C-alpha cells in the first residue's frame, strides 16, 4: 500500500518538498506519494483532518499554519511544547502527534552548510510567528549569546520572548534593530514576506552590519529579503 504524505501551507506552490521526498523514497525503497496541499487561510484544521480521514499518514506544516498545527495535536513533543508551534503532524489512526524539526534543521544548515559559528552570536530574528517560535530554543541550546525578536506587532515579539523565560531573548519592534543591532549579527527572516514579495522595514545599515542574512523560506529566485540584504551590502546570505 502506498503511504500518503503532503506538505500543507498557504501559499504552497513554491515548495520543493515533493521532489525532495521522492528522492528519499527512491533511496529507501519506500512506497509513498507526497503532494502539496493548499489550505484556505481559515481552513487549516478542516483540510488537515480531511487529509488524514482519507488515509493520509503525515503532514509537513509550513507558513502560516504552525501554531494551528500545535493546537490540533493530541500529543506534542517537548520541542513543540516549548515552541507552541509544530511543523510535523503524524497520524496513526487514533492519535495525532506533533513535532517541530525547524530549529534542528536551521542550526545544522547554518553550522554545517554555511560555516556559521553560533556560540556567543547575536541573532536578529525577524517575525514572531510559528517559524520563529520553532527555532528559538535550538538556537539557545547552540549557545547564541542573544536573540532580538523584531515584529510589526510588538506584543507578539514580547510574548515570544516571555515564553522562553531566558534573559538572552528580547522582543520589540523593527525600530529596535537600528538602535540595538550590533555589528557581526546573524540576521534571520522567519516571516512569510519573501513569499509575497514584500519588503521588511529593516534599515539598510542593519543589513550592512550583519555578517550573514538567512531567509527561512525559499523560492525559485532570491526572496525580497535576500535581495534587500545583498543590495544593502550584507557580505553573505542564503535561504533555507
Predicted segments with their positions:
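Glycine-rich adenosine-cofactor-binding loop
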Residues: 9, 100-103, 110, 114, ...
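Conserved S-adenosyl-L-methionine
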Residues: 141-146, 232-235
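NAD(P)-binding Rossmann-fold cofactor-contacting core
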Residues: 144-164
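Short acidic low-complexity segments
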Residues: 167-184, 205
Amino acid at each position: 500500500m502506498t503511504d500518503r504524505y503532503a506538505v500543507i501551507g498557504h501559499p504552497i506552490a513554491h515548495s520543493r518538498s515533493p521532489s525532495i521526498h521522492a528522492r528519499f523514497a527512491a533511496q529507501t525503497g519506500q512506497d509513498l506519494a507526497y503532494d502539496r496541499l493548499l489550505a484556505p487561510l481559515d481552513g487549516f484544521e478542516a483540510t488537515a483532518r480531511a487529509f488524514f480521514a482519507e488515509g493520509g499518514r503525515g503532514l509537513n506544516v509550513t507558513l502560516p499554519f504552525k501554531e494551528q498545527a500545535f493546537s490540533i495535536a493530541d500529543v506534542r513533543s517537548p520541542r513543540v511544547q516549548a515552541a507552541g508551534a509544530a511543523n510535523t503532524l503524524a497520524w496513526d489512526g487514533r492519535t495525532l502527534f506533533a513535532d517541530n524539526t525547524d530549529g534542528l534543521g536551521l542550526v545544522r544548515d547554518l553550522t554545517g552548510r554555511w560555516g556559521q559559528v553560533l556560540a556567543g552570536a547575536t541573532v536578529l530574528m525577524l517575525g514572531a510567528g510559528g517559524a520563529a517560535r520553532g527555532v528559538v530554543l535550538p538556537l539557545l541550546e547552540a549557545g547564541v549569546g542573544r536573540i532580538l525578536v523584531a515584529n510589526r506587532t510588538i506584543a507578539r515579539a514580547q510574548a515570544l520572548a516571555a515564553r522562553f523565560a531566558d534573559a538572552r531573548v528580547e522582543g520589540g519592534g523593527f525600530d529596535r534593530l537600528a538602535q540595538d543591532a550590533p555589528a557581526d549579527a546573524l540576521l534571520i527572516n522567519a516571516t512569510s514576506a519573501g513569499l509575497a514579495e514584500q519588503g521588511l522595514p529593516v534599515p539598510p545599515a542593519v543589513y550592512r552590519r550583519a555578517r550573514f542574512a538567512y531567509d527561512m523560506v525559499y523560492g525559485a529566485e532570491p526572496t525580497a529579503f535576500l535581495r534587500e540584504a545583498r543590495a544593502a551590502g550584507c557580505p553573505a546570505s542564503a535561504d533555507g
